[in-house]
Amino acid sequence: MLLAHLPELGSTRLIKSRNPAEALQKLNETLTENVRRLVVIGGDGSLHLAANHVLKNGYTKQVALGLIPAGTGSDYARILRLSGDPLQALHQICTAVPRKVDVLRITDGNGEVRYAINTFSTGVSGWVSRRLAGLAVKGSAVYLRTTLKAFISFEAVDCRVVVDNTPWFEGPLYLLAITKGSHFGQGMHISPRASLDNGLCEVVAVEPMSRWRLPLRLGRLYLGNHLSASYVHYRQGRTVVIEPITNNPGFEIDGESTDAASVTVETVPAALTMLA
């Protein structure tokens, strides 16, 4: 049904892919100087892939990105207040006034650069992403089971965090999230004060917690009323440097697992044009 309505976008070419490598190959073949809009039908991972291609290949002044949520994780769609109904989301894209949004530029110790449209995090979220990356079958139920297992068995990681050239936190962490959007992890309201276009990133650190306190504190994280809690550290900034102290905890970028010894995260203002 959705395919029948795609001509509402104007002259349209549909790209289908079975994996990220094929998607990138087809984007290379398809994106030309004549393309003005790139609409992703998928989740946060698919949008992450498309946004990185646009950012790394110099299409940011030419191409506006749209999203029709259809993937396992759709936190960015929630942030943009896009409808979960594909036809409604398509209508929103067709009638939207393009808006500029910030992104996060992530540089690892080897100088490799990637971009996050929403979130870069470590701790329990990195643990979850590592395990999901190795699973052949994915979906909301698998994500929920993996997350619950993580909250029960995960051990805190030691990190040193510097924000805007000032030491901010050092010690054990359960979760460290650096975000542009308000939600991640399939609905966790981790950064309730976030803005997509203020030139700042949100930095939220959650200290380790006992198992018996976990349900209540986890509930606060999902509801978004945790920033004043004693076990949470919060601030805004433009540049964040993360240095694991004891071991490599594993990181995630927009839900995609990655490894690095140390990481620098920088806010890039007005980097992308979104249709929402």
Model-derived regions: residue spans:
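Catalytic core of DAGKc-family lipid kinases
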Residues: M1-A4, I15-S17, K56-Y174
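Short, solvent-exposed amphipathic alpha-helical segments in soluble enzyme
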Residues: M1-A4, L55-K56, A133-G134, P192-S195, ...
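ATP/NTP phosphate-donor binding region
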Residues: M1-I41, H48, N52-H53, N57, ...
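Glycine-rich beta-strand-to-loop/alpha-helix junction loops that act as flexible
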Residues: I41-G43, I68-A70, K180
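Short amphipathic alpha-helical segments
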Residues: A51-V54, R78-L80, H189-I190
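Glycine-rich phosphate/pyrophosphate-binding beta-alpha loops
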Residues: S121, S125, A177-S191, S257
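Short acidic/glycine-rich loop or secondary-structure boundary segments that cap or lie
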Residues: S125-V128, F169-G171, H183-G187, R211-L214
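ATP/nucleoside-binding phosphotransfer catalytic cores, i.e., glycine-rich phosphate-binding loops
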Residues: V163-N165, E170, S195-L196, C201, ...
